A protein has these predicted regions:
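Generic cytosolic/nucleocytoplasmic N-terminal low-complexity/intrinsically disordered segments
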Residues: 1-4, 32-34
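N-terminal secretory signal peptides and thylakoid transit peptides that target proteins
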Residues: 2-20
Length: 181
């Protein structure tokens, strides 16, 4: 490199550091200033008594929650392990934005299949914001979805539908024990 390129690179680096130093205190203040939230998160409080099946659905006032199913499938040729998880996260909103594009809830789903014949875990994931009926989590009984991925509580079971590139799962799962808290 010649001296001009080194000088330009050094100036850019110094300017970047200066800009970061000037912006960092404001960014840190916004992150730590919980009073500026327009939509505060609900707190988990001791003594709350969960009521099932009502509490198996979404609680959108909380920051994060998830629905998780794991199990073994006894296929004729080999056993298969599976895992399905749907996450719901509520981002911190600093301003009232009536737009349907405003991400009030973020949905993330992950599914995996352990098939010994593949020699590795096969997995897929999806993410979307709620709205436009593309993703969501219902309050009350469990019903979470992203596009055509679904986990839904029926009367005495859960139905899961995962259509991924390398695998698909269509499951009906029944609880074998009461909820474990």
């Amino acid at each position: 490199m010649n001296a001009d390129k080194i000088r330009i690179f050094s100036r850019r680096r110094v300017l970047g550091w200066l800009a970061g130093a000037l912006i960092a205190p404001e960014a840190l203040a916004q992150i730590t200033n919980h009073e500026s939230r327009i939509t505060p998160f609900a707190s988990v409080v001791p003594g709350y008594r969960l009521q099932f099946p009502r509490d198996e659905g979404s609680h959108p006032e909380f920051r994060i929650e998830w629905w998780y199913i794991t199990g073994w499938l006894n296929e004729a040729t080999r056993p298969l392990g599976f895992q399905i998880t749907f996450f719901r996260a509520r981002p911190e909103l600093k301003h009232a934005n009536p737009s349907a594009f405003n991400p009030r809830q973020i949905m993330v789903a992950h599914a995996a299949l352990s098939d010994p014949s593949h020699g590795r875990l096969i997995h897929a994931q999806r993410a979307a914001r709620d709205g436009f009926a593309l993703a969501g989590a219902d309050a009350g009984r469990t019903r979470v979805w992203i596009d055509d991925w679904r986990l839904q509580q029926e009367e005495n079971s859960y139905r899961a539908r995962i259509l991924a590139q390398e695998f698909s799962l269509e499951l009906e799962c029944a609880a074998t024990q009461p909820p474990l808290l």
